[in-house]
Amino acid sequence: MGGAMLRGWLSRGVSRENVRVIEPFADAAKALREELSIMVLDDIAALAPDFVPDIVVFAVKPQGMDDIVPSYADFAAKGVVSLSIAAGRTISYFGTHLGDGAAVVRTMPNTPAAVGRGITAACANDHVSAAQRTACESLLEAVGDVVWVEQEEMIDAVTAVSGSGPAYVFLMIECMAKAGEAQGLPADVAAKLARATVAGSGELARQSDEAASILRQNVTSPGGTTAAALDVLMADDDGLQPLMDRAIDAATRRSRELAG
């Protein structure tokens, strides 16, 4: 996720000279340098002694956070805001490891950020200034839309809907393509039809002011082919809505478990 956002930032004008990446794994560091032409260091200690960033972005897998986050406590003590895109790590977690006065913005982005079509939900603690909030929002807006939630516990549901959501959409493409194959379409044709249909419908929904339900009704003729399919997909007991309810509930519960 961090790599996707970094590529999105750079492609949308964030200056390479203003970026420092800490990557302890040599192969990954080399790949980033060669691909993105940015400064990649193997440890925070390699930064210039007088270097103080405007924002520290934590894009680390949850299991690696305990070893990494405390190293940035000095920056937090200097008032630098920490922006986390790590799943399952709460604002209080950062307060424990960075200091009680640390300015922290917890976010949940998603992978379409890599192509500038992401959406990020963000939640800030009381130590984040208005200027810092604006700076973080500007950074996040470079890769898509931003919504702020005032209650941190909402991040679990956000994770289930939009953080994990791209995987659901990709699965929909897979399922549509396989169903098309089952009806006799060549695999490559079915895949192209499914991919383009989902991508185009998503863009139509994004640009439209109408609710998704209205857009659905606009392409559904009574007694037609779409209506026949929707009778299956909208069945009360085993249709898409109860299935999605269970999926979102499972992801939300798992997000809470990861947060401890």
What are these regions (language model features)?
Residues 105, 154-160, 212-217:
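Short pre-catalytic strand/loop immediately N-terminal to key active-site residues, enriched for Gly-Thr
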Residues 26, 36, 44-122, 126:
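Rossmann-like NAD(P)(H) cofactor-binding subdomain of soluble oxidoreductases
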